[in-house]
Amino acid sequence: MILLAAASIGLAGCTKESSAISTPSSSQQNSSISTNTNVNSETSDIRNVSNTVKGDISQIDVNNIHSLKIQSNAAIITVIGDKQINQAELEVSKGNSQGMDTNVTTSIQDGTLQILLKNKLKIINTEPLPSLTIRLPYKEFKSLEIDNEVGNISVESELSVQHLNVSSGTGDVTVTDVIGMESSNISTDVGSVEFALPDQPAPLYVNLSTKIGTIDNQVALEKETNTTKIVAEELHGYVGKAQSESATLNIFTQVGEITFKN
């Protein structure tokens, strides 16, 4: 199995909506981050974290936010739901890497909070990638989308979302206690996927597939079918009673194993 110790993403829920992005807290005075903020129908915040080691934390009012979209070319990404906070918290850390410049752009448009992280390679980099951690107050989302070209993704804790889409080009994906009420699509080209169901999930149709790898299923499924072709494997079935209106969970890897558990 090829693992790239690069990035991880974690997710969680939200409760408020607005388009205000605050500047970093004063406790992070050692970070050289410039912030531009426009509080209109669209709010944007652009920062360079090339010299940020410990991490820069900013807050985002999510009263008017119904969707979240995260895009990165290389990072450790974590999204966490937290019922103890009222605003979203965004933390970016460069770590010890000296080989790249990192820029993060946040914007709010049409009810969607978009977070874009881009790294520009200066020299050959052998250090850990920058990390992006997002803590969200609990609320219901229409969609949560994460797309990371290189790096691990971790989605964890409580999150109420209708559609969950998580994708990594190279890296592991871990989803814990979070599921889309209507659909969940989890994939990685090179890496493993571990999906842990929340307690007492609603009826769910499960479709697991790997081109080169194995499937470790630890959940009792109704109408289970399992197909193995040389190095490819597929598993289908229902969690709970089979229903035509069940939510769907699709997990796919090109190269890597899948673990599905309670």
Segments and roles (model prediction):
Residues 1-6:
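Sec-dependent N-terminal signal peptides
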Residues 10-13:
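C-terminal motif of bacterial Sec signal peptides marking the signal peptidase cleavage site
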Residues 15, 92, 102-104:
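Post-signal peptide N-terminal segment of secreted/secretory-pathway proteins
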Residues 18-69, 76:
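N-terminal, intrinsically disordered, polar/charged segments of Gram-positive cell-envelope systems
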Residues 27-29, 35-37, 74, 150, ...:
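Sensor of tandemly repeated, compositionally biased sequence architecture
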Residues 50, 55-69, 76-84, 101-167, ...:
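Right-handed parallel beta-helix
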Residues 74-75, 83-85, 90-96:
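N-terminal beta-strand/beta-hairpin edge segment
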Residues 175-262:
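Short, surface-exposed interaction patches in beta-rich subdomains
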